[in-house]
Every structure is written in structure tokens, then in C-alpha cells.
Amino acid sequence: MPYVNIKVTDEGVTAEQKRQLIEGVTELLERVLNKPRYATSVVIDEVATDNWGVGGESVTTLRNKERNSGQR
């Protein structure tokens, strides 16, 4: 019984995008591992950017730097 946990920052992932992720991951496990759809669980966790760090800085800080420098 596969369990897949997808973590994304809480920056506006839509319900439709989540639906597509759940469907796509389920199809992938069915195709690659021959796992039945009914046995696959997919959980999407949205994490606040203050709670996600990359390279020693929070995503909030990184996004602010990107905005200030015109990147992204």
C-alpha cells in the first residue's frame, strides 16, 4: 500500500493542481510498480515559507531577496 507525501510551500497551489498531482502520482505507481489505484494514498502538505529553509535561509527570506533584486 504505497503512501506518498508531497510537501510544497503555501504559495498558491490550486485545487486543480493538487488534483493533478494526486492523479499523476497514482498513475505513476500503477504503471511503474503495478500498484492498484485503490491502494495508493497521496497526501499534500502545504508548508509556510517561514517553516521551509534552503541554503540556511527561510523561503520567505529568499523570496524577499528575489523580489528586491527583480528575480524569479
Set out the residue ranges of the language-model regions.
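A domain-level signal for the structural core that forms small-molecule/cofactor-binding pockets
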Residues: 2-72
